[in-house]
Curated annotation (Swiss-Prot):
<comment type="pathway">
    <text>Amino-acid degradation; L-lysine degradation via saccharopine pathway; glutaryl-CoA from L-lysine: step 6/6.</text>
</comment>
<keyword id="KW-0808">Transferase</keyword>
<dbReference type="GO" id="GO:0033512">
    <property type="term" value="P:L-lysine catabolic process to acetyl-CoA via saccharopine"/>
</dbReference>
<feature type="active site">
    <location>
        <position position="380"/>
    </location>
</feature>
<feature type="domain" description="Lipoyl-binding">
    <location>
        <begin position="2"/>
        <end position="77"/>
    </location>
</feature>
<comment type="function">
    <text>E2 component of the 2-oxoglutarate dehydrogenase (OGDH) complex which catalyzes the second step in the conversion of 2-oxoglutarate to succinyl-CoA and CO(2).</text>
</comment>
<dbReference type="Pfam" id="PF02817">
    <property type="entry name" value="E3_binding"/>
</dbReference>
<dbReference type="InterPro" id="IPR011053">
    <property type="entry name" value="Single_hybrid_motif"/>
</dbReference>
<comment type="subunit">
    <text>Forms a 24-polypeptide structural core with octahedral symmetry. Part of the 2-oxoglutarate dehydrogenase (OGDH) complex composed of E1 (2-oxoglutarate dehydrogenase), E2 (dihydrolipoamide succinyltransferase) and E3 (dihydrolipoamide dehydrogenase); the complex contains multiple copies of the three enzymatic components (E1, E2 and E3).</text>
</comment>
<dbReference type="InterPro" id="IPR036625">
    <property type="entry name" value="E3-bd_dom_sf"/>
</dbReference>
<dbReference type="GO" id="GO:0004149">
    <property type="term" value="F:dihydrolipoyllysine-residue succinyltransferase activity"/>
</dbReference>
<feature type="domain" description="Peripheral subunit-binding (PSBD)">
    <location>
        <begin position="114"/>
        <end position="151"/>
    </location>
</feature>
<dbReference type="GO" id="GO:0005829">
    <property type="term" value="C:cytosol"/>
</dbReference>
<dbReference type="InterPro" id="IPR006255">
    <property type="entry name" value="SucB"/>
</dbReference>
<keyword id="KW-0012">Acyltransferase</keyword>
<dbReference type="InterPro" id="IPR001078">
    <property type="entry name" value="2-oxoacid_DH_actylTfrase"/>
</dbReference>
<dbReference type="InterPro" id="IPR003016">
    <property type="entry name" value="2-oxoA_DH_lipoyl-BS"/>
</dbReference>
């Protein structure tokens, strides 16, 4: 008996998807609920599990193929493995990209079968074997950091070897030895490119700047951070302060929490904040909903959960849908200042940056304070200068006096 492997139902906003990775090759034994193939949309990666024990007998759609909801991907034979005739396994004589990838991971399959999809993909992409890397996770499981350390170690060794080789052969290296590599863009990267270009072409985007003294928040975190973490089991970060300040500013300036729909302006009376998160696949913006009703501990917990889902490739379409305003924190990468791009149909985005000690004038004295630049990009079709500057000044004042955030004044 053959069990069909079908593309799962795609959201209404997603027209099609791409076959990203086959984790099994023809003839491999599969177990019920084991992930056998991943489907990539322009937002998330969907895992397709086996519906029954059996053998992968047919692959209809190879990696890189475009598919739609309920389209046939392959078939699983539920007969005994020994009874499956090789004649029923439909494969071409010429190795496909899927065959080559499966061959690369076959030797390490038994060691990484219980790893997350993201870990398995990283192992395959960098030609690594799980049994050659010391895992630091629970039960010896590999983490992303383990793989990154291994990649960095190998790269360092490669650089050292290349330097030694170059020293001996530099005089004989020809100019023609330079090379290029062309790879197709992922669906997510193509979607990001489309959205960024759309934002630049369809909005009257402008950016206004300010700076904030972060000393009060840093003092508060130093004083209460340990107690906060002990009581709530989550670290007190900066983002909860940023979100609380943004929500209060949005209440005072509803134009920033609005969007343009044709000739109408839609004012939102709820506060769903998108948070820019860097993932192995690219930058995504999962949404924290009803932020005005969340405590700082709840905000920190939700941010942590969304960040972990992003790193593990577990974000759902629902996690990424909606949002009335976006916060992006380039400071985690060391950015001192930037002009963030609006995330349509939203009308504004707030950029936070690196906190740096700088000399400033305070009460007639030059003092050293931890300062951070703020950048608000906004759609000038809807938001005027008075509202944009007032919005940013409100955030500055709230962050410089965090007690007002807690008292909601």
């Amino acid at each position: 008996m053959a069990i069909e492997i079908l593309v799962p139902d795609l959201p209404e906003s997603v027209a099609d998807a791409t076959v990203a990775t086959w984790h099994k090759k023809l003839g491999d034994t599969v177990k019920r609920d084991e992930v056998i193939v991943e489907i990539e949309t322009d937002k998330v990666v969907l895992e397709v599990p086996a519906l029954s024990d059996g053998v992968l007998a047919e692959v209809v759609q190879a990696e890189g193929e475009t598919v739609v909801s309920k389209q046939l991907l392959g078939k699983i034979s539920t007969a005994q493995e020994g009874d499956v005739s090789s004649a029923t396994l439909k494969a071409t004589n010429e190795p496909t990209p899927s065959d080559r990838q499966n061959a690369a991971i076959e030797n390490s399959h038994n060691h990484n079968a219980d790893q997350s999809p993201v870990i398995r993909r990283l192992l395959a992409e960098h030609d690594l074997q799980a049994d050659q890397i010391q895992g630091s996770g629970v039960g010896g499981r590999l983490t992303r950091e383990d793989i990154e350390r291994e990649i960095a170690k190998r790269q360092a060794q490669q650089v050292k070897q290349e330097a030694a080789t170059e020293q001996n052969t530099i005089s004989t290296v020809a100019y023609s030895a330079r090379s290029e590599k062309r790879v197709p863009m992922t669906r997510l990267r193509k979607r990001i490119a489309e959205r960024l270009l759309e934002a630049k072409n369809s909005t009257a985007m402008l950016t206004t700047f300010n700076e904030v003294d972060m000393q009060p928040i840093m003092t508060l975190r130093k004083t209460y951070g340990e107690k906060f973490e002990k009581q709530h089991s989550v670290r007190l970060g900066f983002m909860s302060f940023y979100i609380k300040a943004v929500v209060e500013a949005l209440k005072r300036y509803p134009e920033v929490n609005a969007s343009i729909d044709g000739d109408d302006v839609v004012y939102h009376n709820y506060f769903d904040i998108s948070i820019a998160v860097s993932t192995p696949r690219g930058l995504v913006t999962p949404v924290l909903r009803d932020c005005d009703k969340l405590s700082m501990a709840e905000i920190e917990k939700q941010i942590k959960a969304l960040a972990e889902k992003g790193r593990d490739g577990k974000l759902t379409v629902e996690d990424l849908t909606g949002g009335n305003f976006t916060i992006t924190n380039g400071g985690v990468f060391g950015s001192l200042m930037s002009t963030p791009i609006i995330n349509p149909p939203q009308s504004a985005i707030l950029g936070m940056h690196a906190i740096k000690e700088r000399p400033i004038a305070l009460n007639g004295q030059v003092v050293i304070r931890p300062m951070m630049y703020l950048a608000l990009s906004y759609d000038h079709r809807l938001i005027d200068g008075r509202e944009s500057v007032g919005f940013l000044v409100t955030i500055k004042e709230l962050l410089e006096d965090p007690t007002r955030l807690l008292l909601e004044i």
